[in-house]
């Protein structure tokens, strides 16, 4: 559906000029040149006067031409009267006037104002109905209002003129000329074929042009631009295809190797108690090794200073810094840091995974995405109503002769216009195109290109030919003179032709006379003999007439040729050059560059595509493409300063000097350098006033809102180079479609992966929104006995293998017989020995790779497997791989210790006995995911990895070797056990198309029932949406019959790119898709148990148009999930409808929406505050982020926030969590810039700490094993055992809780971040004592020093910074998939501890958390014990914000976590720094602001109920709610619903205490407070007498003495818990 644009209509317009006023843009912007001198000004004035004279001359010529138009053909009548003798003079006049015109044009070009800007043009995108505005480059001044000149000049392309010129090729004239075959006439005719004109045309045949092929910067024109673009796009697709296959290969090798190592280490620890399951924590952390390698490489690369160009400002690179001193200090403290890369500090792991080898790091580094910019352009369609419009009406726009020319016509480009400052410096002010229907003219995403064109281009022959060509738009308005003169010459030609016809007729008459004379010669022979002399005279006269005719004809030909040379000179020479040098042109040797010297370039001249509707397609190309051979590097870089003046966000990481991205075409094709950040002098400044140039009004407009300017400099190092600039890595819709096409071809007819790609919906612009559904095919449900017996017979040769295996065994299989060898060759099994002749096998496949892989192994791996992938993926996924691997595996240089993909070859046929379990006695209900797939021996020294059968294909199960043959009864019983655990998905995949159909429309909620119908629908199936059942339900089901053998797979939904400017999210989902479709063990296990539904791009329209946040209709799609409209928000509506249809029969257990963040570093997650299920008294929604923090080194757990319901209303995370009862509903945020990591970071980490902002316990490891043992266990004295971990959840005897995330200071001063600093040794009573060797200052060295406004800024003294690139973003998506595996693994292991809590339990949970904030004194041990007990029971105790730290301070301190207290109490407390404050002082502060301290927690619920009964509570609750919105606090603790508002109960009590002034202590008296009589009694009058007061007090004292017991009960009810 089309929506009218506010700025323009829906009609499609041709490209027209706008009427500009005489005021230049430089006057409007008040641009001044500070470097002007008086002498220069005088010189410039003289130049301006000369230029004005030239302009006046050109204007006079234009006026004369206009008069000539009005008079018609009168000025050409004189030319028609020219005689044949004056034709040469006519030709000379043409040359003279053309020279004058060229000279005047060259002067006028120099005098063009140095301002380049863009104007909007309307167009339609290809195959859509969208109406788009795009910028176009125009001149600064001296333009005509209309483009009639261009249209009239194009008339010479018609056939009328060519036919007139070709009239003289008829046979009549040629026959007449050929009648005279005498040698005299032929010689005379051939005189005009001399080398005079041919040499002029054949000048390009000389060696001058051929020599130029070897010159630098050889510019050549592209004749077939359409073929050139398509050819380049095909080459890019081939590169992406090879990269895609290589990424899958490298990814499979890394993940399979990692998984097998973990299984080996896990096998060695079966005999030990798995109390904490440490293999979960150390699982899959190979990226920790890689980040150190990446960081060191980045620092070495950035130590070199930037290339010195013609800088005009002093430059200090913000990205480079010297950190050698800080690193030396850190290494001196930690002498054992160098060993950290080779070994884990984990004593139980005897053979750790060594991932610091160079080959491993290079394999990870080679995995990346490549999106080459600038090869997809936007198209224009002429509407059917305008199909009658001639091609001549398409206007062409003018561009000046400048050094920098801009373009944004490619996909996702959003440049509006550019203004060049009027000085000698290359400084450009850029204005971005805002989002459609956006009120504010600003943007945050930018993507444009700038081309550097040297001066030599304008003196080049190609440019000269262009000036003589029909491209009169380069000549400007002065070409009117040429047009008028050409009309005059055309009339002269017509007159000459008419005269020629008269001469021809005269010749015919003379010829007839000659024939009559010849006929009479026979009769008058005798007479002619007498008069022979007279005939000779006549013949001579006849020859003279013929010669005269030939001369006139040649003159005509010369005139025609000269006219053609002026009009079509470039076409003729270009065709000649193409004919002459076809053999020299090859696209492979080109460095194809672009220069924006032409706006409209119709690449479909020969073939115009016509649709059924009659629409004619034209390509909009913002540049005049040409190729450049032998591009030369500049001796001195050409520096340009860019200023983007309408940036939107006030806080952006550009403030810290981070550079935008740039992509140079020359560097990519010559140096193979892709996107890089090499800009410098970066500034991000707030503008004093917001300005925007309105091209329609030709004036600068000023607005009230704020905008910001991003300034940066760039050095062009190559001539004719085109550089693309972007705020983040661009990821276009076309690149996504090509990527999905590669996946379709790869997974076509795949034996195991069930891949479906469907269209979710059509977007508003008419594009297809893809949705992916990925899982594995179901296993066979029934097994034949015969097949099982055959499989058992095949296992007869299986024997038990120890660490040392027999020489004649292939991984536990006997290969001595020839029959088994033939079977091995048929099925593609690979021997680990070098040659098949040698019956020796290397059985230890998991030897640590100390020296890495040798050259032969690396080369064989890359060559052999790459060939196998390319040849075998289309037909059979694994066939080619086995062939390629077998050919290369026989290489003598193969490294034995390298576990490669060759050792994990894939079997073509699946065997049915592969799902057998071998432990009948063991209960698998609470087993881990990889335990189900790998059933290994419990013995320490008996481990064998099977490379046969399914382990050889998918490594899903480990079949043990036994000497005895398994019987059929044992096998049958184990198959029954396996059948109960099967998961099905084929039915779901078959009906997936029906789920996408729009059966009904989501309507709004009913006002009467407040949406109870919709809620009721989900309540009916509420239990089905739960991840796990309750404990009571499990007990009740114990006596019930067994469940069905089939289990439906659960659903995981992932979405991305709802905001177009957040491109990093697309790269992350790109990496996850590559992970889930690859043939690695993690992905295979996930596909076996889950169905993945992925929507990789939700806002396709905004991505194509270059928007930052909004869609085509001007809506933020991430705020429309609550009530989407099908025809306005089609993608959101269809996605939500799909999830609702799925939830009817299946379970959605996980949802994540990928986003990007512009104000923070690293990666983090936003989750929902409420949670339904709990794991070990911990919310299930908090488990996944913690697991992710241990796997991904650049994940910041500190920035992970669980937001409330009233924040980000309508977001996908919130709505999916509410409506589908999802605990795990997240928003995954990735920084747009990079990673900020501490300099002391290493691969060691603590399970309960964040590795980025809290230092590890590794520093205590330097002083020996007495203080620290076991990595995470601390032994500081005899009273604390090594198994007691120090964290927020565990209690230490005789002391308080020690939290790893909280920092402690000794100064006894309360700080905002709940941090305390201690300079002495850390002591906790008599039970806990830490030695002097363990320094707390080294461990917690000002952790929160750099915390400002919830953002961590870049401090190069404490942190290292690393930019995100395609490699890191890709691996972020891969690690997300690994964390999903670990998360499911964790839940499957702790399945018995998962429970669901009701609303009452949640209220009790809130109450228990409140006890953590009770104000406790030092000597009050009862309160401390209660607080510790509440921390044990509640999972919220491990948070830093909810816990209260206790110190040696004499008085209790208030916490600043409460959002209403910190503004009042903290200020007053900071003023009073005396240590000896009494409790009365703090109680006075509490009573002053209406806070009461409660002792019992049960009264809290009673007070909530009592407040809800109040009749006039609305006003007070509303006041509290509005006050909370003004403060804008992100954390909301202990909120309770009161009517329509959800507020903090303590805030309500504070308001009630202010109203109730009767009680001196500031307490209110319950529900009786609403009575009007009581209210009147409570109001005190200042004018009351003292006697009345005394009488009242006496009466009160009597009543109090009688009812003491009653007053005590009432006072207990009045007290309320203060939640801090």
UniProtKB/Swiss-Prot annotation:
Record topology, Extracellular segments: 1-1367
Q: Which residues lie on this side of the membrane: Cytoplasmic?
A: 1389-1620
> Which Gene Ontology MF annotations are present?
metal ion binding; metallocarboxypeptidase activity; tubulin binding
- Give the span(s) annotated as Possible malaria epitope: 497-559
**EC number of this enzyme:** 3.4.17.-
State its cofactor.
Zn(2+)
What does UniProt report about how this protein is used? Possible candidate for an effective malaria vaccine as determined by epitope response in sera.
Q: Which regions are flagged for Basic residues bias?
A: 1598-1620
Q: What GO biological process terms are annotated to this protein in UniProt?
A: proteolysis
Q: What does the record give as the active site?
A: 1229
Q: Which family does it belong to?
A: Belongs to the peptidase M14 family.
**What is this protein identified as?**
Putative zinc carboxypeptidase
Q: What is the lineage of its organism?
A: Eukaryota, Sar, Alveolata, Apicomplexa, Aconoidasida
């Amino acid at each position: 559906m089309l929506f009218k644009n506010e700025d323009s209509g829906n009609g499609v317009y041709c490209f027209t000029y706008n009427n500009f006023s005489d005021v230049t843009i430089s006057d409007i912007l008040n641009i001044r040149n500070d470097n002007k001198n008086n002498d220069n000004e005088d010189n410039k004035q003289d130049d301006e006067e000369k230029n004005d004279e030239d302009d006046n001359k050109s204007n006079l010529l234009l006026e004369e031409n206009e008069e000539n138009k009005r008079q018609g053909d009168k000025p050409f009548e004189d030319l028609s009267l020219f005689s044949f003798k004056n034709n040469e003079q006519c030709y000379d006049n043409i040359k003279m006037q053309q020279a004058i015109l060229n000279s005047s044009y060259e002067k006028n070009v120099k005098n063009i104002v140095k301002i380049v800007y863009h104007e909007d043009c309307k167009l339609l995108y290809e195959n859509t109905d969208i109406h788009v505005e795009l910028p176009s480059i125009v001149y600064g001044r001296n333009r005509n209002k209309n483009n009639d000149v261009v249209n009239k000049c194009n008339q010479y392309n018609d056939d009328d003129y060519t036919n007139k010129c070709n009239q003289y090729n008829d046979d009549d004239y040629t026959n007449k000329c050929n009648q005279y075959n005498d040698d005299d006439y032929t010689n005379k005719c051939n005189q005009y074929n001399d080398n005079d004109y041919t040499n002029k045309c054949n000048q390009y045949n000389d060696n001058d042009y051929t020599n130029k092929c070897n010159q630098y910067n050889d510019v050549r024109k592209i004749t077939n631009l359409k073929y050139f673009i398509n050819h380049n796009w095909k080459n890019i697709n081939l590169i992406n295809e090879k990269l895609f296959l290589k990424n899958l290969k490298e990814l499979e090798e890394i993940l399979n190797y990692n998984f097998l190592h973990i299984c080996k280490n896990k096998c060695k620890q079966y005999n030990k108690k798995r109390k904490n399951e440490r293999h979960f924590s150390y699982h899959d952390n190979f990226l920790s090794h890689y980040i150190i390698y990446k960081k060191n490489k980045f620092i070495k690369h950035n130590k070199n200073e930037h290339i010195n160009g013609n800088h005009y400002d002093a430059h200090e690179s913000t990205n480079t810094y010297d950190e050698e001193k800080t690193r030396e200090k850190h290494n001196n403290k930690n002498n054992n840091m160098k060993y950290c890369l080779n070994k884990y500090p984990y004593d139980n792991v005897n053979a750790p995974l060594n991932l610091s080898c160079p080959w491993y790091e290079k394999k990870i580094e080679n995995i990346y995405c490549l999106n080459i910019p600038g090869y997809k352009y936007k198209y224009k369609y002429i509407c059917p109503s305008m199909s009658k419009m001639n091609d001549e009406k398409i206007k062409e726009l003018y561009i000046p002769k400048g050094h920098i020319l801009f373009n944004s016509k490619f996909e996702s480009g959003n440049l509006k216009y550019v203004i060049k400052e009027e000085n000698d410096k290359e400084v450009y002010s850029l204005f971005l195109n805002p989002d459609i229907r956006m009120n504010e003219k600003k943007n945050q995403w930018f993507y444009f290109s700038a081309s550097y064109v040297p001066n030599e281009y304008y003196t080049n022959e190609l440019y000269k030919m262009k000036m003589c060509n029909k491209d009169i738009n380069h000549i400007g308005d002065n070409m009117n003179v040429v047009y008028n003169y050409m009309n005059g010459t055309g009339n002269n030609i017509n007159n000459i032709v008419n005269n020629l016809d008269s001469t021809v007729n005269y010749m015919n008459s003379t010829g007839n006379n000659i024939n009559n004379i010849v006929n009479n010669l026979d009769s008058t022979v005798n007479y002619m003999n007498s008069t022979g002399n007279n005939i000779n005279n006549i013949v001579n006269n006849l020859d003279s007439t013929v010669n005269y005719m030939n001369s006139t004809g040649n003159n005509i030909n010369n005139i025609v040729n000269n006219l053609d040379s002026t009009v079509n000179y470039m076409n003729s020479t270009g065709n000649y050059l193409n004919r002459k040098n076809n053999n020299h042109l090859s696209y492979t040797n080109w460095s194809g560059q672009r220069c924006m010297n032409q706006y409209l370039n119709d690449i479909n001249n020969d073939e115009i595509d016509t649709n059924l509707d009659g629409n004619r397609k034209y390509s909009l190309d913002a540049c005049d493409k040409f190729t450049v051979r032998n591009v030369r590097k500049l001796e001195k870089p050409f520096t340009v300063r860019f200023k983007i003046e309408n940036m939107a966000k006030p806080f952006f990481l550009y403030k810290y000097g981070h550079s935008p991205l740039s992509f140079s075409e020359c560097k990519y094709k010559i140096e193979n350098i892709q996107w890089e950040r090499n800009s410098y002098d970066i500034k991000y400044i707030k503008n004093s006033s917001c300005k925007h140039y309105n091209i329609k009004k030709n004036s600068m407009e000023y607005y009230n809102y704020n905008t910001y300017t991003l300034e940066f400099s760039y050095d062009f190092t190559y001539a004719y180079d085109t550089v693309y600039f972007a705020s983040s890595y661009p990821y276009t819709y076309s690149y996504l479609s090509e990527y999905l096409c590669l996946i379709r071809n790869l997974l076509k007819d795949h034996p195991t992966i069930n891949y479906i790609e469907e269209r979710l919906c059509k977007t508003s612009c008419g594009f297809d929104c893809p949705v992916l559904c990925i899982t594995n095919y179901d296993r066979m449900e029934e097994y034949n006995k015969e097949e099982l017996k055959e499989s058992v017979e095949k296992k007869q040769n299986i024997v038990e293998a120890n660490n040392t295996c027999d020489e004649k065994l292939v991984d536990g299989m006997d290969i001595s017989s020839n029959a088994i060898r033939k079977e091995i060759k048929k099925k593609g099994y690979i021997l680990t020995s070098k040659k098949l002749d040698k019956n020796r096998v290397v059985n230890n496949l998991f030897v640590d790779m100390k020296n890495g892989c040798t050259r032969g192994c690396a080369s064989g791996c890359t060559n052999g497997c790459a060939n196998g992938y390319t040849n075998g993926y289309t037909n059979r996924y694994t066939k080619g791989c086995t062939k390629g691997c077998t050919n290369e595996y026989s290489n003598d240089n193969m490294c034995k210790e390298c576990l490669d993909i060759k050792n994990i070859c894939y079997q073509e046929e699946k065997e049915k006995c592969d799902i057998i379990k071998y432990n009948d006695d063991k209960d698998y209900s609470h087993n881990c995911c990889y335990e189900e797939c790998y059933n290994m021996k419990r013995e320490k020294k008996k481990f064998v990895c099977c490379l046969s059968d399914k382990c050889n294909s998918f490594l899903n199960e480990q079949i043990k070797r036994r000497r005895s043959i398994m019987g059929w009864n044992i096998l049958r019983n184990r198959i029954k056990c396996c059948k109960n655990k099967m998961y099905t998905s084929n039915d779901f995949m078959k009906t997936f198309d029906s789920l996408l159909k729009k059966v009904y429309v989501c309507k709004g909620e009913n006002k009467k029932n407040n949406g109870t119908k919709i809620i009721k629908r989900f309540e009916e199936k509420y239990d089905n949406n739960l991840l796990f059942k309750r404990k009571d339900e499990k007990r009740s089901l114990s006596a019930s019959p067994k469940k069905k053998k089939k289990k439906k797979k659960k659903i995981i939904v992932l979405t991305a790119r709802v905001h177009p400017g957040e491109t990093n999210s697309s790269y992350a989902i790109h990496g996850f898709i590559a992970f889930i479709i690859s043939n690695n063990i993690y992905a295979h296990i996930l596909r076996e148990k889950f169905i993945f539904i992925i929507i990789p791009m939700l806002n396709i329209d905004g991505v194509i148009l270059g928007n930052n946040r909004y869609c085509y209709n001007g809506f933020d799609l991430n705020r429309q999930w609550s009530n989407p409209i099908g025809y306005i928000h089609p993608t959101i509506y269809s996605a939500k409808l799909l999830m609702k249809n799925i939830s009817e029969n299946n379970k959605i257990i996980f949802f994540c929406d990928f986003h990007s963040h512009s104000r923070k570093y690293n990666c983090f997650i936003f989750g929902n505050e409420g949670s339904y299920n709990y794991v070990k008294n911990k919310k299930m929604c908090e488990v996944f982020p913690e697991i992710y923090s241990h796997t991904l080194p650049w994940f910041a757990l500190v920035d992970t926030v669980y937001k409330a319901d009233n924040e980000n209303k309508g977001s996908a995370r919130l709505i999916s969590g509410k409506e589908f009862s999802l605990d795990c509903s997240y928003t995954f945020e990735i920084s747009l810039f990079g990673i900020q990591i501490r300099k002391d970071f290493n691969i060691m980490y603590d399970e309960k700490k964040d590795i980025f902002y809290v230092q590890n316990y590794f520093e205590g490891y330097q002083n020996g094993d007495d203080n620290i043992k076991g990595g995470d266990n601390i032994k500081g004295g005899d009273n604390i055992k090594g198994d007691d971990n120090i964290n927020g959840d565990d209690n230490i005897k005789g002391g308080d809780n020690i939290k790893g995330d909280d920092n402690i200071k000794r100064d006894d001063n309360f700080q905002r971040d709940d941090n305390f600093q201690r300079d002495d040794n850390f002591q906790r009573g008599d039970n806990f004592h830490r030695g002097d060797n363990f320094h707390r200052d080294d461990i917690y060295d000002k952790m929160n020093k750099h915390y400002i406004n919830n953002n961590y800024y870049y401090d190069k003294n404490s942190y290292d910074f690393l930019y995100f690139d395609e490699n890191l973003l890709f691996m972020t998506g891969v690690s997300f998939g690994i964390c999903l595996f670990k998360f499911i693994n964790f839940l499957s292991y702790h399945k018995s501890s998962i429970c669901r809590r009701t609303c009452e339990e949640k209220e009790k949970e809130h109450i228990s958390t409140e006890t953590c904030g009770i104000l406790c004194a030092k000597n009050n041990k009862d309160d401390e014990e209660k607080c510790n007990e509440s921390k044990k029971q509640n999972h919220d105790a491990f948070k830093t914000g909810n816990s209260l730290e206790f110190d040696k301070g004499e008085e209790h301190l208030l916490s600043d976590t409460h959002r209403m207290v910190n503004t009042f109490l903290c200020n007053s407390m900071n003023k009073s720094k005396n240590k000896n404050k009494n409790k009365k002082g703090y109680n006075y502060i509490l009573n002053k602001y209406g806070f009461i301290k409660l002792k019992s927690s049960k009264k809290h619920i009673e007070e909530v109920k009592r407040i809800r009964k109040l009749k006039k509570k609305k006003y007070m609750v509303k006041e509290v709610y509005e006050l909370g919105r003004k403060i804008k606090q992100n954390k909301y603790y202990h909120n309770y619903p009161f009517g329509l508002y959800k507020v903090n109960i303590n805030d309500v009590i504070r308001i009630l205490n202010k109203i109730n002034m009767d009680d001196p202590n500031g307490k209110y008296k319950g529900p009786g407070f609403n009575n009007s009589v009581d209210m009147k009694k409570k109001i005190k009058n200042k004018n009351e007498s003292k006697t009345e007061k005394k009488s009242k007090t006496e009466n009160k004292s009597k009543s109090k003495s009688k009812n003491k017991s009653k007053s005590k009960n009432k006072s207990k009810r009045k007290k309320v818990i203060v939640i801090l």
